[in-house]
């Protein structure tokens, strides 16, 4: 039987359908239903949210397929799941389960310290993290259909997501201003594939959607990332590590949609209870910084 992979246009189109929305991490059917009722456009099924992965340490792997199937059976919105960077078999297992997207994620412990997956070989579209134009372009060349900032997952601290979004957007503007004969040197210096840079220059933007992720903890955080140019928002630990997950979920969805309505964001932020406990980035050891994973 011939293995028919999804075309690049179809995969990118599927990701475009999530634009402007919020994607929430969930660990069971109950949380998935809360996310769907709050207006999430998709959920990410995993065993532990990033804050718990960070706290537990050790090796973090793909979720038990039972959890993924439980979440898939509980909601009608798309379901994503994470595999380790470079783990061919975890990705194939998730594809066989019928997930809607796979996140080749630095939140999990990398399986390969040299190679990312060739995502063009799969029918299912992939999501990947990036901090700059080099990482973004390499993931696109490998076949990623959606990007997200890496931020610093599980910290409840938005500063790294802001840094990464600003960095990528500044470099897009730089690429757009370069002559085509200057792009090859830029490609060499950044490790960005030349053909992807040409596409970015032609479009004046990335050819795939770029969501914010890694540290979104409040409605204001979500609105901030949208104002900085994010196409949507991933919320990992920020929902179910907060004092009132259902209220936080609804408020973050509304703030993402109405990110320039400050009176509404103020109203949404009232009486929410405590957000997740945050971590100052400077207190993390180099080996604790998940954003450093991937290349």
UniProtKB/Swiss-Prot annotation:
Indicate the residues that form the catalytic site: 82 (schiff-base intermediate with d-ribose 5-phosphate)
Give the EC class as a word. Answer: lyase
Q: Which GO terms describe its molecular function?
A: pyridoxal 5'-phosphate synthase (glutamine hydrolysing) activity
Ligand binding (D-glyceraldehyde 3-phosphate):
166
Q: Detail which positions bind D-ribose 5-phosphate.
A: 25, 154, 215, 236-237
Gene3D superfamilies documented for this protein: Aldolase class I
Reactions accelerated catalytically: aldehydo-D-ribose 5-phosphate + D-glyceraldehyde 3-phosphate + L-glutamine = pyridoxal 5'-phosphate + L-glutamate + phosphate + 3 H2O + H(+)
Q: Is Transcription tagged as a keyword? A: no
Q: Which GO terms describe its biological process?
A: amino acid metabolic process; pyridoxal phosphate biosynthetic process; pyridoxine biosynthetic process
Could you tell me which pathway this protein works in?
Cofactor biosynthesis; pyridoxal 5'-phosphate biosynthesis
- SUPFAM superfamilies named in the record: Ribulose-phoshate binding barrel
Q: Which Pfam families match?
A: SOR_SNZ
Which terms are listed as keywords in the entry?
Lyase, Pyridoxal phosphate, Schiff base
**EC number(s) from the headed UniProt entry:** 4.3.3.6
What family is reported? Belongs to the PdxS/SNZ family.
The entry's function note states: Catalyzes the formation of pyridoxal 5'-phosphate from ribose 5-phosphate (RBP), glyceraldehyde 3-phosphate (G3P) and ammonia. The ammonia is provided by the PdxT subunit. Can also use ribulose 5-phosphate and dihydroxyacetone phosphate as substrates, resulting from enzyme-catalyzed isomerization of RBP and G3P, respectively.
Report the NCBIfam families cross-referenced here. PRK04180.1 (NF003215), pyridoxal 5'-phosphate synthase lyase subunit PdxS (TIGR00343)
Quaternary structure (record) = In the presence of PdxT, forms a dodecamer of heterodimers.
Protein name per its UniProtKB record: Pyridoxal 5'-phosphate synthase subunit PdxS
